[in-house]
Amino acid sequence: MRNAQKSSGMPFHRYTPFQDQITVEMPDRTWPDKVITKAPRWCAVDLRDGNQALIDPMSPARKMKMFDLLVRMGYKEIEVGFPSASQTDFDFVRQLIEGNHIPDDVTIQVLTQAREHLIERTYESLVGAKQAIVHLYNSTSVLQRRVVFNQDEDGILDIALQGARLCRKYEETLADTHITYEYSPESFTGTELEYAVRVCNAVADVFEASADRQVIINLPATVEMATPNVYADSIEWMSRHLHPREGIILSLHPHNDRGTGVAAAELGYMAGADRIEGCLFGNGERTGNVDLVTLGLNLFVQGIDPMIDFSDIDDVRRTVEYCNQLPVPERSPYGGDLVFTAFSGSHQDAIKKGFEALERDAAAAGKDVADVTWQVPYLPVDPKDLGRSYEAVIRVNSQSGKGGVAYLLKNEHSLDLPRRAQIEFSGVIQRRTDTVGGEVSGAQLWQIFQDEYLPSGKADGQWGRYSLGSVKTETDDDGGMTLHASLTVDGAQVSRTGTGNGPIAALLNILTQDGVDVRVLDYSEHALSEGGNAMAAAYVECAVGERVLWGVGIDANTSMSSLKAVISAVNRAIRDAQS
């Protein structure tokens, strides 16, 4: 097949390939053979890196709500602000400390640049804290060295070392606070690896990194510049060359400029990282920080404990939306409104069969469904494990098929339609959506079903030539049955009698006397619930003249439900012939 694509005409020549800017060579890479088996150390940076990117930065009340959420979910390292950058951030750090809001097993993290008055102010904010991470950073990239700082490599290294020494100096003012240091060569992805490791190792030496006093070296993809495998190569290279490695907690801080922040974080973790910084639902500058929800639940669906509680994902989403004043997109992995929803007919059918297989497997194992291995097509996680219901799993529109329609009827109304009846009713829905368009809600689906099969006071309009009232049966010595039925025929009350080898056959005899040619082709029934007072549903496939249609009947009496189903099929055939 000929490729018909043409040049875009866009000025792509203005952009330099990453490999022509930064060399990352790792021919003996080992990370592709690694498998993730446990969660990394997490650090949530919603209150600083996320907050600075908001159109309307969080108020103190919204910050506290976000902090409480992060603590409740299980995050043990939480970046809470840049206290030297604003009075608001400083006051929030003080509020957390003085109000005893920080649990003993949670470490707050504060950010600072490498200038003395900023570092001094940072330490002032931490007075009274039990433990804290002081996060020092300066930009090291080729581009920023040239256009922002106008400094050579040695000049930028001096900035980092001066900042590290000042941190050690002011550490003495916090004798009762356990300080852990973190250093970030900002714009790491735009920095030569040899230079990045030179700066990081020099800073780690000032901080006296050791197995007993570990230092966090954080390698940010401040701007995502290449494919995730390149980031992973750079992380493995750094992991091999940082020293002392046992004294280093290697941390990642991916952004999402190319849309691959999650992949970069996962591959970087495989490449030797120990820790990942990010935000819930990927908030952050430009296209955002890496999404901690996606990262955590990607582990969960692989059978790995994320060490974070996502069991009420809707509450997490609502809180984040309130605090950030930004919506979480409907397609956001795991947390969006539509992520567990199937509109496609083939998908719906597979999901329906998956649920049925799950129930069979659980019954065979003598277990509750919640205790067996989750295996349902198109659903990588059980929505109930995240606090969701199954209500939104299947929704009906013009792309839907019998599986979705059948699932909704069974899940919401306990009606388990035979397969051919599913096909017939899905055709009714298809004609409706083709004509009207849009989605059919569960309530609308039920209304359409009633209007089609169960004309009653709840139907949109009364229709049908026949309506069945009371019945009485008599059985003779030969097993034959006589049915005395009270019917409404064309609006008039009549009493009719028919005979046959059962109640359905006797009703067919009555209808034949009335000039209706009807035969039963298939029949099934089931209880709608358990217990002695359960309603029964009957499904009867009838040939009425040249038309083959299904009828449905619901009644507390099984025989009555089957008779109503025959009347339903006959009425539908007559209406169909008249339309």
UniProtKB/Swiss-Prot annotation:
Pfam families reported for this sequence: HMGL-like, IPMS_D2, LeuA_dimer
GO-annotated molecular function: 2-isopropylmalate synthase activity; acetyl-CoA C-acetyltransferase activity; magnesium ion binding
Cofactor dependency: Mg(2+)
Keyword Cell wall biogenesis/degradation: no
Enzyme type, top EC level: transferase
Record's keyword annotation contains rRNA-binding: no
Record's catalysed reaction(s): 3-methyl-2-oxobutanoate + acetyl-CoA + H2O = (2S)-2-isopropylmalate + CoA + H(+)
Signal peptide: none
Subcellular location: Cytoplasm
Renumbered residue ranges of the record's region Regulatory domain: 456-579
Pathway(s) annotated for this protein in UniProt: Amino-acid biosynthesis; L-leucine biosynthesis; L-leucine from 3-methyl-2-oxobutanoate: step 1/4
Keywords of the record: Amino-acid biosynthesis, Branched-chain amino acid biosynthesis, Cytoplasm, Leucine biosynthesis, Magnesium, Metal-binding, Transferase
Pyruvate carboxyltransferase domain sequence ranges: 40-314
GO CC term (a single one): cytoplasm
E.C. code: 2.3.3.13
GO biological process, one term: L-leucine biosynthetic process
Residues annotated to bind Mg(2+): D49, H253, H255, N289
InterPro entries: 2-isopropylmalate_synth_dimer (IPR013709), AIPM/Hcit_synth_CS (IPR002034), Aldolase_TIM (IPR013785), IPM_Synthase (IPR005668), LeuA-like_post-cat (IPR054692), LeuA_allosteric_dom_sf (IPR036230), LeuA_N_DRE-TIM (IPR039371), PYR_CT (IPR000891)
Record-linked SMART domains: LeuA_dimer
Stated role: Catalyzes the condensation of the acetyl group of acetyl-CoA with 3-methyl-2-oxobutanoate (2-ketoisovalerate) to form 3-carboxy-3-hydroxy-4-methylpentanoate (2-isopropylmalate).
Similarity comment: Belongs to the alpha-IPM synthase/homocitrate synthase family. LeuA type 2 subfamily.
Oligomer status and interactors: Homodimer.
Stored HAMAP family: LeuA_type2
Protein name: 2-isopropylmalate synthase
Annotated source species: Pseudarthrobacter chlorophenolicus (strain ATCC 700700 / DSM 12829 / CIP 107037 / JCM 12360 / KCTC 9906 / NCIMB 13794 / A6) (Arthrobacter chlorophenolicus)
